[in-house]
Regions:
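N-terminal loops that bind phosphate or other acidic moieties
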Residues: 2-148
Length: 148
């Protein structure tokens, strides 16, 4: 049996894919706030913010601790702001086949999609749906409006 996770608002939820946002600056906190503004409070969802003067080993330990805190046995998805950046590289160091995945280039549509599928989807399906949603909503307004 998997643990029941507290949501932070007195509601308990069953096993789900955990989410950890790892970004430059406070972006992770803001993405979490924006996600919860749209879809409501999220259980098993943590942030790790990387500052320019931070001790990177300490931040890596924070990532590992965040992973442990959101892992209910269904897997954990780490989302980072930019592939090749320090947050992404630290997240990739925790990659574990079938258990921990990293998606770089996080955006709000991706997070909203993950929020809607992570309690029922398998890991790979959730990763694929998040990536698809992230790509789908990148649009150039003038091209959309003129059909060009």
């Amino acid at each position: 049996m998997h643990p029941v996770l507290p949501t932070g608002i007195g509601v308990l939820v069953g096993p789900m894919i955990g989410v950890v946002l790892v970004t430059h600056g406070r972006l992770a906190d803001e993405f979490k706030a924006a996600t919860e503004h749209v879809v409501g409070p999220q259980a098993a969802f943590r942030t790790v913010c990387i500052g320019p003067q931070d001790d990177m080993e300490a931040r890596r330990d924070d990532i590992l601790s965040a992973i442990k805190s959101v892992d209910s046995g269904q897997g954990v998805i780490l989302l980072t702001d930019m592939f090749g950046g320090t947050p992404s590289n630290l997240a990739i160091s925790a990659l574990e086949s079938g258990k921990i995945e990293v998606i770089a280039g996080v955006n709000l549509p991706m997070l909203i999609k993950l929020a809607s599928v992570r309690s029922t989807a398998k890991m790979q399906e959730a990763v694929d749906k998040a990536q698809e949603a992230g790509r789908k909503y990148i649009r150039v307004a003038s091209k959309e409006l003129t059909g060009g």
